[in-house]
Structures are given as structure tokens and as C-alpha cells.
From Swiss-Prot:
Belongs to the MinE family. GO terms for biological process: cell division; regulation of division septum assembly. Gene3D superfamilies: Cell division topological specificity factor MinE. It holds the Pfam family MinE. This is Cell division topological specificity factor. Prevents the cell division inhibition by proteins MinC and MinD at internal division sites while permitting inhibition at polar sites. This ensures cell division at the proper site by restricting the formation of a division septum at the midpoint of the long axis of the cell. InterPro entries: MinE, MinE_sf. Keywords: Cell cycle, Cell division. The keyword Cell cycle applies.
Amino acid sequence: MALLDFFLSRKKNTANIAKERLQIIVAERRRSDAEPHYLPQLRKDILDVICKYVQIDPEMVTVQLEQKDGDISILELNVTLPEAEELK
């Protein structure tokens, strides 16, 4: 029976395996290319400036860059400031 299973098994051909691997690589590249190289430094610089005036948790600052219609880039900055009572 094992001999029959060996000949009847349907293995993926190498072209399909290569195609799947290439799709994974392309998807990873798109994710990494979506964020410009300067964005982490920009986030750090913005956080440093905010911390000069208000003591906040670094996790309370989010910086995102969105691409719209190819040529338009939108920089979104969200800062959650502490309540007035927490500042005292």
C-alpha cells in the first residue's frame, strides 16, 4: 500500500512552491517599503520635543505616513496628553 501511495501522491511542483515564496517576499517588501527610512527618527525627534514641555509615555505618540493617489503623502500624528491632574 505504501508503494501505491508513493506513486499516487500529488506533490506540489517546484513552480508552485517558488511562486508562493515569491508572493511572500513581495508582500514583505511592500510592508517594509511603505514606511520611509526617516520615519523612526522623525518619531523620536517629535517625542523629544514634546517631552521638553510635557512628561508623557513614549507609547502615547503614534506617527503614521499614508500614501494617497500616488503623489500625496499624509503624515498623521496622534499624541495622547496626560490629564491636568496628572501634571501636578
